[in-house]
């Protein structure tokens, strides 16, 4: 700064401080002004003042101090520009950080004291920008000890003056000009050495003074004769210099190397020369420049370094627990109230519908009775006698038919609920809807009302239930009247506009052969026949006969097999997958959601698989009809249950399993042993429901095992298979005994025919009369009976053809090794082909020929969302356990691991990453590992996989947001780091999102036990790799690919940003050692989210590839 600039600034300061009148009043004259300007000029240019008394003048010293401070600020600003590039990784805002460290404008007393002490030569003793740069550049060299500097022009092996010792400094020659902003050259500074001023530090190896940063305490040292140390610092007096005394501070570095310079914990340092104990009700961390008030509900004694925030942690967890309890209880209460109201409406509708049909039956009976009496009286008695009989009828309360009709109609209209319900199935009945608002009545006669459709009339829940149960009761009445009704009669009866037509499908197959690709074994061979709509076809045979294989081949689910022959649909060669929306497949295992009720399971499939344009009233009718026909009314509101939690009985569960496919109104229904494990009554109830479906035109094919005679006679057709997948019989059930009798196979008395035929095919029954036909010849007999071509090997020697084994060769070691290698290679190839076929099958696209438009993906996402939300609500105890474990983990880690200022809390964050990753991964595995079978079944039926995946991920967002809050409620308030709660919460949310995606992938690609093992192993291994020194390129690459590295960096950066002032070197040193960049906090967050999103994509692709349809 030149003289003219100094003059202008001085005049402005004088103008601002006092006005002209005060100047004259205090007797200031021209001589004082000239003296002040001269002093400022010399001090600012690094000159000394000969007369010390001039600096004791109160009017001169503040002005000179301001000028020195401006020069010092300019030099530190120049140093900031020089070091800003190298320190970019640890300084986010250079100006702000430098201002927090060297902005002494609030109190310049230490400068004034130093001006007095140095007799005005302070400008010649302060380090230039080049010397400061020389000192600070040493910290970027990892091998350099901050206590020692390299030799330089002033301190070297040939020149080591007293100012080179720690805590001392020297001045330049009095005639030499010093430019503090010079960042290139060292001035020769070896004269007039003296102890360092308070508020400055003089490093060993430099002869100049550097101002201590804010947050430091740099008093003059005093000699401790016991330890020979210059306290509070750690340097000793040099040997051989008896006149040398303790000086000032000697170093400013990281907390490990220069902890004595930092303002001690429990105190704060408003200036670098003043330390004040912390008052009661306040706390002061190490390196503080001011005391901070403690929060309410916390107690802070004097000299407190940190406040106890355990109470806030308890309050947070109490608030979170309260909110969760409110959410769960309110949701459960809402669901319970809704279900209770629906149950009341349903029960009322059932009572009214049954009462109405009882009245209708009574009316019909009365009509027939009156008609019979009239006819009898007319034939036997006179008119007078007939009049007497009429009086008798009146006495009995029965009038003529018109009076009865009027009475019944009036009783029907007397109920407000029944008067407003839309009754579309009544025949030749008029219902008047008389409301309180005086609307005109509507006459409904099984057709649309003029100006209004049924969909518009059926609005309320009561009306919908009444509509459904009136239809159900009418169907029951019709079934009772037409017990022997045939399929053609049903078709004729279904011509009214109320009945929806189902797509009729006939399946026919010719020379159907199924061969395993792995070993070439034929599981089906030359199977020919057909399955017609409106009929129930039973597939029977001994074990290994290929019953399930036939069902899978017809349903298009045979994977890993080579299929030959023809499968025709309605006489056309089309893919069965084109009709998957109207084909139901009931697996042998009861794949039903155990944490849903019976009604909820059925309703979910109805919503997702019934036509999208079907009205709600018709959907209610479908579901209620299935519940009623399967006898599930008593348990409709009961949870199905799981292995761990008991629910409904096994027979009821089996019926629910069948109802999931019946509720979508299929055209073809395949069932794999639906009666296994059921008693006779349950089996009959199930077959009665299937019989009703068949009467509506459904083509039903089912595998059964040893049915009773009653169930056997319920079937329309029978497919009997022998071992090896050969057909023994395919035709009507009523003609099976006739056919086998023609072969000389007669069923003994009191023996169930299907059991006897199975024993014959198993070879258990040896004697079969005088026919001389062996059980192995029965398939060939059936082919000859139907006129099919018999394969050559069967014609020659059927049994030998089935039992011939390939030559295994000799037992020589060479052949054995070649055989083993050949078998191993064959197994590898077969496994590869099987996986390829599964992937190809999963991604098979077929033209939709079902003519059914199911709900869109977005609508199915909504249904999945509601179902999964209910399941999570019913897993409240399990969720509470997860939260409790996280709570305990946060409390334990927060209590055992204290936040360290030296490492910015890195050890605690390392254990946090391991604990939270491990616990959240294991919990997230349940989202996909527990219901793989359910997903495979739903996906095979045509439900959207993306809707299922997105719904589960959406519901898990609740845990992703809540679990970090639960953990931090203990960990954060126990450790009380300098970073904010919000910063820690954001990082932890992103971490949980990341590990949840990884858990999805593990759950889908691995078995549950293996997935749990990897969930424990991955966080530990990846965290250890991420915290290892990056000495090799491989370790660095692996660390960059592991999510713990980015989570830990985000945690440390968030905490390091709150350390400034005296902590600047510590912050830069720690970040440089770890390889972190303070500007990459957002990048770390984005990478965690990207990993979570990528792993979710991988999990979704795996879900599509690995699904078993």
Curated annotation (Swiss-Prot):
Q: Which organism is it from?
A: Arabidopsis thaliana
Family, per the entry?
A: Belongs to the ABC transporter superfamily. ABCG family. Eye pigment precursor importer (TC 3.A.1.204) subfamily.
Organism's domain of life?
Answer: Eukaryota
By its UniProt entry, which Gene3D superfamilies does this protein fall under?
P-loop containing nucleotide triphosphate hydrolases (3.40.50.300)
Tell me where it resides.
Membrane
- Quote the record's binding site residues for ATP: 541-548
Q: Where is the composition biased (Low complexity)?
A: 411-425
Name-wise, this protein is ABC transporter G family member 24
Q: What are the boundaries of the region Disordered?
A: 378-399, 411-439
Spell out the InterPro entries in the cross-references.
Answer: AAA+_ATPase (IPR003593), ABC_transporter-like_ATP-bd (IPR003439), ABC_transporter-like_CS (IPR017871), ABCG_dom (IPR043926), ABCG_transporters (IPR050352), P-loop_NTPase (IPR027417)
Residue stretches making up the ABC transmembrane type-2 domain: 859-1059
Q: Provide this UniProt record's keywords sorted from A to Z.
A: ATP-binding, Membrane, Nucleotide-binding, Transmembrane, Transmembrane helix, Transport
Per the UniProt record, which residue ranges are transmembrane? Answer: 877-897, 904-924, 954-974, 986-1006, 1007-1027, 1085-1105
Q: Where is the signal peptide?
A: none
Record domain ABC transporter: where: 507-749
Q: Provide a GO CC annotation, any one.
A: membrane
Membrane topology type? Multi-pass membrane protein
For this chain, one GO molecular function annotation is: ATP hydrolysis activity
């Amino acid at each position: 700064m030149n003289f003219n600039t100094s003059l202008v600034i001085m005049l402005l300061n004088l103008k601002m401080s006092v006005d002209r009148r005060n100047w004259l009043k205090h007797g200031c004259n021209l001589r004082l002004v000239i003296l002040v300007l001269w002093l400022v000029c010399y001090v600012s240019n690094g000159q000394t003042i000969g007369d010390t008394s001039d600096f004791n003048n109160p009017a001169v010293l503040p002005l000179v101090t301001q000028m020195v401070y401006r020069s010092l600020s300019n030099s530190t600003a120049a140093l900031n520009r020089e070091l800003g590039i190298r320190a970019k990784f640890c300084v986010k805002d250079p100006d702000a950080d430098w201002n927090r460290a060297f902005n002494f404008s609030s109190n310049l007393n230490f400068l004034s004291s130093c001006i007095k002490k140095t007799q005005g030569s302070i400008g010649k003793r302060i380090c230039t920008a080049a010397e400061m740069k020389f000192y600070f550049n040493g910290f970027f060299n990892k091998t350099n000890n901050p206590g020692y500097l390299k030799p330089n022009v002033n301190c070297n092996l040939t020149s080591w003056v007293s100012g080179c010792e720690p805590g001392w400094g020297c001045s330049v020659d009095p005639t030499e000009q010093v430019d503090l902003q010079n960042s290139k050259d060292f001035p020769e500074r070896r004269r007039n050495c003296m102890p360092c001023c308070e508020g400055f530090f003089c490093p060993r190896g430099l002869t100049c003074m550097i101002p201590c940063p804010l947050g430091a305490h740099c008093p003059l040292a005093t000699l401790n004769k016991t330890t020979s140390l210059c306290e509070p610092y750690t340097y000793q007096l040099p040997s051989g210099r008896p006149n040398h005394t303790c000086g000032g501070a000697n170093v400013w570095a990281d907390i490990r190397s220069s902890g004595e310079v930092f303002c001690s914990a429990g105190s704060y340092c408003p200036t670098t020369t003043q330390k004040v104990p912390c008052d009661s009700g306040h706390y002061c961390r190490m390196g503080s420049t001011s005391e901070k008030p403690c929060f309410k509900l916390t107690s802070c004694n004097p000299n407190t370094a940190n406040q106890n925030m355990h109470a806030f942690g308890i309050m947070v967890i109490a608030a979170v627990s309260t909110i969760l309890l409110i959410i769960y209880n309110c949701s459960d209460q809402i669901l319970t109230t809704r279900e209770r109201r629906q149950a009341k409406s349903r029960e009322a509708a059932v009572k009214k519908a049954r009462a109405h049909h009882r009245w209708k039956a009574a009316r019909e009976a009365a009509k027939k009775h009156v008609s019979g009496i009239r006819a009898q009286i007319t034939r036997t008695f006179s008119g007078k006698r007939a009049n007497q009989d009429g009086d008798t009828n009146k006495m009995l309360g029965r009038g003529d038919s018109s009076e009865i009709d009027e009475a019944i109609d009036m009783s029907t209209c007397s109920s407000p609920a029944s008067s407003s319900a839309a009754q579309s199935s009544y025949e030749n009945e008029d219902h008047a809807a008389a409301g309180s608002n005086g609307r005109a009545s509507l006459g409904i006669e099984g057709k649309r009302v003029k100006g209004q459709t049924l969909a518009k009339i059926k609005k309320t829940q009561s009306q919908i239930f009444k509509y459904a149960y009136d239809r159900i009761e009418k169907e029951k009445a019709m079934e009772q009247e037409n017990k022997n009704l045939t399929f053609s009669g049903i078709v004729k009866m279904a011509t009214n506009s109320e009945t929806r037509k189902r797509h009729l499908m006939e399946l026919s197959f010719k020379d159907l052969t199924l061969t395993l690709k792995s070993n070439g074994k034929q599981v089906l061979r030359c199977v020919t026949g057909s399955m017609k709509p409106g009929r129930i076809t039973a597939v029977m045979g001994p074990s290994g006969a290929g019953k399930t294989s036939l069902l899978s081949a017809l349903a298009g689910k045979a994977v890993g097999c080579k299929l030959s022959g023809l499968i025709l649909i309605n006489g056309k060669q089309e893919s069965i997958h084109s009709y998957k929306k109207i084909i139901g497949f009931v697996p042998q295992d009861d794949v039903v959601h155990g944490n849903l009720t019976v009604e909820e399971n059925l309703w979910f499939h109805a919503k997702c698989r019934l036509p999208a344009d079907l009205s709600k009233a018709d959907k209610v009718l479908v579901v209620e009809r299935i519940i009623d026909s399967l006898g599930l009314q008593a348990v409709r509101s009961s949870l199905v249950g799981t292995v761990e939690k008991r629910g409904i009985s096994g027979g009821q569960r089996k019926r629910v399993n069948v109802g999931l496919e019946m509720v979508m109104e299929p055209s073809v229904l395949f069932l794999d042993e639906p009666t296994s494990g059921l008693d006779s009554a349950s089996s009959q109830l199930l077959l009665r429901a299937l019989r009703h479906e068949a009467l509506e035109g459904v083509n039903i094919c089912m595998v059964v095992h040893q049915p009773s005679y009653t169930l056997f006679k319920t079937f329309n057709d029978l497919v009997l298979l022998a071992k090896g997948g050969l057909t023994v019989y395919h035709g009507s059930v009523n003609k099976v005994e006739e056919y086998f009798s023609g072969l000389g196979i007669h069923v003994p008395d009191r023996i169930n025919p299907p059991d006897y035929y199975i024993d014959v095919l198993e070879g258990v029954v040896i004697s079969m009369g005088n026919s001389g036909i062996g059980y192995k010849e029965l398939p060939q007999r059936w082919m000859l009976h139907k006129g099919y071509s018999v394969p050559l090997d069967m014609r020659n020697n059927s049994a030998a053809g089935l039992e011939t084994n390939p030559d295994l060769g000799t037992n020589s070691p060479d052949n054995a090794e070649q055989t083993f290698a050949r078998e191993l290679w064959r197994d590898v190839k077969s496994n590869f082909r099987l996986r390829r076929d599964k992937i190809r099958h999963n991604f098979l696209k077929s033209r939709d020929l079902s003519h059914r438009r199911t709900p869109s993906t977005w609508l199915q996402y909504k249904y999945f969302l509601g179902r999964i939300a209910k399941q999570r609500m019913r897993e409240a105890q399990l969720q509470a356990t997860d939260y409790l474990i996280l709570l305990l983990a946060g409390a334990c880690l927060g209590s055992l691991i204290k936040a360290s200022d030296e490492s910015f809390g890195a050890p605690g964050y390392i254990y946090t990453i391991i604990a939270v990753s491990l616990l959240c991964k294991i919990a997230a595995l349940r989202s996909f590992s527990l219901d793989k079978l359910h997903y495979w079944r739903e996906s095979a039926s045509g439900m959207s996989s993306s809707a299922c995946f997105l719904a589960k991920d959406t519901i898990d967002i609740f845990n992703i947001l809540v679990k970090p809050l639960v953990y931090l409620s203990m960990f954060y308030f126990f450790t009380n780091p300098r970073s904010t709660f919000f910063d820690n919460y954001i990082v932890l949310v992103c971490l949980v999102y990341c590990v949840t995606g990884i858990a999805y992938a593990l759950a889908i690609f691995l078995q549950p036990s293996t997935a749990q093992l990897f969930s424990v192993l991955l966080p530990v291994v990846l965290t250890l790799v991420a915290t290892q020194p990056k000495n090799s390129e491989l370790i660095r690459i692996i660390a960059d690919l592991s999510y713990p590295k980015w989570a830990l960096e985000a945690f440390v950066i968030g905490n390091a940003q709150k350390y400034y002032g005296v902590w600047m070197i510590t912050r830069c040193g720690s970040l440089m050692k770890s390889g972190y960049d303070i500007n990459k906090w957002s990048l770390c967050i984005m990478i965690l989210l990207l990993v979570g999103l990528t792993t979710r994509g991988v999990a979704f692709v795996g879900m599509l590839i690995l699904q078993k349809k």
